[in-house]
């Protein structure tokens, strides 16, 4: 992709838009973690399913999707009902679950934390949307949501599976989750159900892959994949689409595919 580095603004815009149009399509849902919340029609189920799928979204995508489906099976394919009504006896069998470093004890702690969120806020959407209305800044939202999630007693070990913006993490999985539920278009991929958060407030879900592609395209100079890099690349993408910068998450994925 070296030939793209010296593209003009107009050329880069055309490239990003072309790749966005190619990859922001329903046929790519099945192989992506977003397929897990797409398995449900009730938005409350989608929010829970999406949160747990995003939580384990690192590594091979096929393995992520397969393991996230196992999570849904553990919840009897009724995630919101499970989270709101499960007893200790219902939750204990989750300890047999393992996906890479996310083990059964982590799963139990996350389910109990999710139960607390739903008791206090009703839904995950209400937690995120009310937090944005209160703070008006997505960085503050990510910090507040994490504190609220771990407000109840839990095993400290599980905290590593919920990125901390206060420690400078890129928060890729949280930003991906936010993209799923905040972005609104007519493509049928993202849900766009959280209307109280503007798309312009979103940040790119930055990881090793999208970071490398962003650098190759000349969109990012910072070497570390941390929150500062997330801010930098999103600021650059806002020059191409101020109202919807994270639309180019699809483009960066596509650019990586094309470079292989």
Describe each PLM feature range.
Residues 1-260:
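HhH-family (HhH-GPD) DNA N-glycosylase catalytic core used in base-excision repair
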């Amino acid at each position: 992709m070296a030939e793209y580095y010296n593209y003009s603004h107009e050329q880069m815009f055309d490239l990003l838009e072309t790749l966005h149009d190619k990859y922001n399509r329903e046929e790519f849902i099945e192989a992506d973690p977003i397929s897990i919340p797409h398995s449900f029609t009730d938005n409350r189920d989608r929010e829970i399913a999406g949160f747990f799928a995003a939580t384990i979204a690192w590594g091979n995508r096929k393995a992520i999707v397969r393991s996230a489906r196992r999570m849904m099976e553990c919840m009897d394919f009724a995630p919101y009902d499970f989270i709101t009504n499960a007893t200790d006896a219902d939750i204990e069998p989750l300890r047999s679950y393992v996906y890479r470093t996310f083990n059964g004890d982590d799963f139990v702690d996350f389910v109990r934390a999710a139960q607390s969120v739903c008791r206090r806020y009703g839904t995950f959407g209400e937690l995120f949307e009310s937090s944005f209305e209160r703070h008006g800044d997505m960085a503050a939202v990510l910090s507040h949501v994490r504190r609220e999630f771990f407000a109840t007693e839990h095993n400290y070990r599980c905290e590593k599976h919920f990125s901390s913006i206060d420690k400078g993490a890129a928060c890729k999985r949280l930003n991906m989750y936010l993209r799923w539920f905040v972005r609104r278009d007519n493509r049928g991929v993202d849900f766009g159900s959280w209307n109280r958060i503007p798309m312009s407030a979103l940040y790119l879900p930055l990881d090793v892959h999208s970071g490398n592609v962003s650098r190759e395209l000349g969109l990012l100079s910072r070497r570390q994949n941390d929150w500062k890099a997330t801010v930098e690349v999103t600021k650059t993408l806002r020059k191409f689409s101020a109202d919807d910068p994270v639309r180019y998450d699809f483009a960066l994925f596509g650019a990586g595919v094309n470079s292989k």
